[in-house]
Amino acid sequence: MEFHTFGDEDNKKVLLLHGMLCDWKKFRDLLKPLEESYYVIYPAMTGCYDGSADFVSFTDECAHIEDYVTENLDGKLDAVWGASQGATVLTELLARNRIKVQTEILDGVYLAHQGRLAASLGLRAFLKMQKNGGRISKVMQNVCKLMGLQNEDLAEFSLMYWGASASSMKANLIENYTYQINEAIRDSETKVHLWCGSREPYAMKSHKMLKKYLRNYTEKIWPDVGHGVMMYFHTDEYLDAIRAIVR
């Protein structure tokens, strides 16, 4: 994992974690205005940048974040935000409770099981897309339909990092589709904001699962949109929603 920082170090410290097999730089292009108000830390997940080792697990990614925050930020963050798989990783970070996080925003978190079959189908589709320069195959379209995604939701594929190895892709997909909630999350005192679109059935199922454990949370369902649509197509409104939370 690599870490990239921008903004005034005297401002609130906000960590922004990208989605599965995505390019942190493309997420920064959308989220960059936040750097005017916050000291922003963008991790690049293992396997998702040139010269990286292969991705192994969510726990490894959490350990990298914990080590960085402990060594560079006195073990504390004012807020963390994660999209899709980034949000899922942050649920594990919360459960581990090894650094202090005041506020957590989970957008499109996926914890409802889709299983190894979905991971296998996804791997085939990702490898084909990688070979075809990122074009969305029919297999991937079918996988996305199983996830409740529609055509506008597929814009998030433009944020992908296509240099990932087959090993990293496989490990990512297996983790993403088989990860189970770490029940230690019930001990966290962090304020958690659950976000998703009204057309995200798996994310909404995941919210229901998390509510059984979280002590302190709010829920925001964006009307008539799917996975990643608010960030990608309604960026200004989306950033304002983040600013309203992280004051």
What are these regions (language model features)?
Residues 5-50:
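Conserved HGGG/HGGXW glycine-rich cap/lid loop of the alpha/beta-hydrolase fold
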Residues 41-79:
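Active-site loop/oxyanion-hole signature of alpha/beta-hydrolase fold enzymes
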Residues 81-90:
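Gly/Ala-rich beta-loop-alpha elbow adjacent to hydrolase catalytic centers
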Residues 95-96, 101-132:
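Flexible "cap/lid" loop of the alpha/beta hydrolase fold
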Residues 115-117, 133-186:
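Conserved alpha/beta-hydrolase catalytic His-Asp/Glu region
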Residues 188, 194-196:
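Short beta-strand/loop motif that positions the catalytic acidic residue
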Residues 198-203, 228:
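Acidic catalytic loop of the alpha/beta-hydrolase fold
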Residues 225-236:
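Catalytic histidine-centered segment of alpha/beta-hydrolase-like enzymes
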